[in-house]
């Protein structure tokens, strides 16, 4: 595939599997920041056809193992993720949704997250953003959600390697339930922990 750098473009998302390393090298050569995300979430309307493009667990294990061994930045980011997750308490927010961030669409619709566009909490044509932020019942409800509300996650052995995401849960749930866990991401956390522990054990033997 061919990329042309679009003027004023801030972000470009594109799917790759076999040649992602070539894309990374191309980006570095062209002084473009690039990140690798192997997590595909369902569409905001709960359509799951795109999930057929997800990597298998075997493919995930191969890529994560490769990055742990060869990518020092990935290891540093993983360490930061683990440290930050260890600091969290039961009363910690899940993420920035409706406590420090919110999104506005081109039609004026206001929604909690860029991936949650069907969950409209107001419209700036009808109300000010301030009023929506302060008065919206849905914003208030989302703001009350804490880690302790995800009962199963509290006792999970892989929680330090996982970041709970209400959007990916909601999009993948047929009923739009943000508390219905996406098991695919639970298994990603399991793979990350097992491979990281193996990496650390190998370092100690050297």
Protein language model regions, located:
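Repeat-unit-sized solenoid/scaffold elements
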Residues: 28-51, 102, 144, 183-205
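Radical SAM enzyme [4Fe-4S]-AdoMet core and its adjacent flexible, acidic
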Residues: 1-97, 103-107, 115-124
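Flexible mid-to-C-terminal extensions adjoining Fe-S/redox cofactors in radical SAM and related proteins
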Residues: 117-206
């Amino acid at each position: 595939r061919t990329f042309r750098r679009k003027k004023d473009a801030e972000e470009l998302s594109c799917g790759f599997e076999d040649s992602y390393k070539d894309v990374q090298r191309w980006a570095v050569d062209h002084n473009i920041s690039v990140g690798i995300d192997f997590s595909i979430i369902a569409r905001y309307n709960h359509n799951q056809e795109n999930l057929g493009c997800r990597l298998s667990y075997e493919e995930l294990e191969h890529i994560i193992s490769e990055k742990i061994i060869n990518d020092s930045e990935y290891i540093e980011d993983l360490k930061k993720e683990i440290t930050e997750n260890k600091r969290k308490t039961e009363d910690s927010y899940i993420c920035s949704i409706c406590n420090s961030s919110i999104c506005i669409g081109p039609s004026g619709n206001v929604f909690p997250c860029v991936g949650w566009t069907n969950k409209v909490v107001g419209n700036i044509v009808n109300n000010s953003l301030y009023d929506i932020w302060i008065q919206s019942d849905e914003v208030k409800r989302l703001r009350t959600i804490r880690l302790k509300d995800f009962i199963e996650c509290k006792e999970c052995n892989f929680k330090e390697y996982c970041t709970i995401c209400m959007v990916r849960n909601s999009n993948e749930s047929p009923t739009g339930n943000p508390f219905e866990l996406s098991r695919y991401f639970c298994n990603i956390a399991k793979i990350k922990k097992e491979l990281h522990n193996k990496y650390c054990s190998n370092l100690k033997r050297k």
